[in-house]
């Protein structure tokens, strides 16, 4: 305690209740190509519905990534997904194909485009990809744009302007086109609703095309329209809102006016919902004033509203017909634009994902201090990427296992050669001189390989597809964590049942299983009446040891991660008897609990002067030695049946054979 120089009471609180924390070991990680969603950003997904809503429908180039993630979610509910994209992929924009660009995620947009550089037009799709070309944005920036009267204009009969006998007169029943004679059309836009006459009652017509001299509409006229008839127009989406935009109370109190606007986002081509024209989002009474906030302090400035709330678009620039948009409210009059904006986005593209992009995506999981991920699913990764995930992610983290599958070519429609080719893929090949011709998968206790692909129904496209099993393998581990503990083997008839299998690409028999298992490949086998089973629990470690089994590897991941996390609170304390005893009293109950849950046979914790010598203390180090006898899973069962004569005592023969 500090030295007090006058009487007083000083209260101190010392916390000596430190324990080993509980850790999650069921967090999956998946990197792949998708049709929609943020790029190079870790997104938490807890169910398949959210996966679909966030990353879009599985398609030809994306279904493997989608179902690898979806298959994991059939067993677990904690998955981090990273979408990767080719650097040549673009977001759809309202400024035309030549302005298309890649905005990978919210961070990139906020750092580069949020200030309104105006390099891509007024709006951009939230994420890159051709799917963004289905989006349409309509903005109603004033009361006039919401609804207005077009001035009386002479109308011509529907038909072709090249026809010589057009005269000023009535538009007849059945016409779907009107030519304007006199003042040019500056009041009606494609998409608007129109009525003829001084009333909004009666038949309503949808304008499908409009220019300065003519517009077409649907349905056809149900009655004659006389020349010089007044046209009543309404914004295309007027009925989606409670009234016209005007002046917000915030701006009114700042002596400004005309700051409100309505904005709506539509699935124009139906790629998001399957129904063209479906309204996706609408924003009512948003503001053009950059400082406008509601009573709760939430911004109403429409670029910020879109940034914080929209799932489909970003703002890029203001309507060029407006003035003062984006200014602060004080004494500001915002332009009363006469017509709404109707902007179809285009220029969005998808490109084939490169190996480099996939590796960069996996780099987002390499730092164990930044993100928690225990089960890494490789999808249809090739040999190079599979080794990268094992060596540069799992082994660097030291708290995760990478699950890989053989390539489709060696286990689908490769009848009779599957086992040999899978083993060649796993081990690589050498020539007659012993020189390596092709490298195989690295030897590592942080890697796990299955034997094939499964045939599965794709409900989104009403078809069947072959899919790698590594998503299911990781899922079995997540389910084992939930039903038992991480140190239980995920294989076998009790915990190794695989879901959503129509059939396997091949079904290894006993001889083939022997070939696979000796090379560290875990067979997946369909048994009549039993289902499809993971029939192994080996890691990719070639060296025979306890760590060539996944349950032991995951046991030590738990022990190392949990104890290390608790031990960091001993940093900068004194290496004395008290600190060492505190460490032992924290670790011992944790290991005793795991022993009681069948994870270890026995253990010992040594943290005293035998390993914390004077030299160790003087070098500012602290050593705790933890000895573990891990529990082993049963891989082989031998049943001996011995026939004994009636007169022979069992004591004479037991243990003799």
Where are these regions (language model features)?
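Surface-exposed interaction regions enriched in Ser/Thr/Asp/Glu
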Residues: 224-235, 255, 262
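Short, cationic low-complexity segments
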Residues: 144-148, 286-292, 645-657
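Surface-exposed loop/edge segments in extracytoplasmic proteins
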Residues: 201-205, 271-280
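E2/UBC-UEV (E2-variant) core
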Residues: 276-317
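Autoprocessing Asn-cyclization modules and mimics
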Residues: 109-124, 130-227
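Charged, amphipathic alpha-helical segments
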Residues: 7, 13, 94-109, 125, ...
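Structured, hydrophobic secondary-structure cores that serve as assembly/anchoring elements
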Residues: 1-102, 107-115, 119-122, 126, ...
